């Protein structure tokens, strides 16, 4: 299951504009207008309109890293990942590394979305080197490590993500997070640990058929056939077609006929 990018637009210009008014007052005023409109449209999830306003803001004043960062975020939402990478790199050049950790994280997510996992890990690692306490960046690198089978590294990243997620980001540790954490432990043969994470995932979202299926497999590995069967049936009831087919097959007959 894919993690979502949790990086938000950077703050507006109200704290910084006084530094520039003497030289580029007219252009910056026009820039500010479109910048604010872009941010508003982004927050309203009107991404095509946000992109148009960000483009106009950059045309009016092209030396503000914040604007390129926000346009990069718009590009992410629109699936324009190559354009997003270009904007985030420009933002870092113009911002004197002010936002470099977050921008490296955003670049990493764009590479991840393009299937360039090596590029994603390199940029997540750069972000972590600058700010090692960004929970969502550790989470992102952990997911990529999981995808390419680096389960030891993924485990380390997920454990650190849990330590460093801020209170405002705890919502990101959703059912998908705990399912993936369980999957990592399962692949490392830590079945009891995996069972614990799947239990948390199901508490977060008791309607997720995949987590029930994964927990069923773990319970079976641990010798709890009745518990496994209960989860297989629950997964099927929630719409898992694979488990439905299995229950109706010769191999799944034992579970289908079990009274629970």
Briefly describe each language-model feature range.
Residues 2-260:
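Alpha-helical tetratricopeptide repeat
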């Amino acid at each position: 299951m894919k993690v979502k990018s949790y990086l938000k637009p950077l703050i507006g210009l109200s704290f910084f504009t006084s530094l520039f008014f003497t030289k580029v007052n007219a252009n910056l005023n026009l820039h500010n207008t479109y910048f604010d409109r872009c941010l508003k449209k982004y927050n309203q999830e009107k991404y095509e309109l946000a992109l148009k306003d960000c483009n106009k803001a950059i045309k009016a004043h092209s030396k503000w890293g914040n604007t390129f960062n926000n346009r990069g975020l718009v590009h992410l939402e629109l699936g324009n990942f190559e354009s997003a990478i270009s904007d985030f790199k420009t933002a870092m050049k113009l911002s004197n590394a002010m936002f470099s950790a977050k921008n490296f994280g955003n670049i990493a997510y764009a590479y991840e979305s393009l299937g360039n996992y090596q590029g994603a890990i390199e940029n997540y690692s750069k972000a972590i080197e600058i700010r090692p306490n960004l929970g969502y960046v550790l989470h992102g690198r952990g997911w990529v490590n999981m995808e390419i089978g680096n389960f030891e590294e993924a485990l380390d990243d997920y454990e650190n993500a849990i330590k460093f997620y801020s209170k405002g980001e705890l919502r990101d540790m959703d059912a998908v997070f705990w399912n993936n954490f369980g999957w990592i432990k399962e692949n490392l043969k830590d079945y009891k640990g995996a069972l614990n994470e799947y239990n948390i995932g199901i508490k977060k979202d008791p309607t997720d058929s995949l987590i029930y299926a994964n927990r069923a497999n773990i319970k079976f590995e641990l010798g709890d056939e009745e518990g496994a069967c209960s989860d297989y049936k629950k997964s099927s009831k929630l719409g898992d077609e694979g488990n439905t087919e299995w229950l109706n097959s010769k191999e799944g007959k034992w579970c289908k006929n079990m009274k629970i």
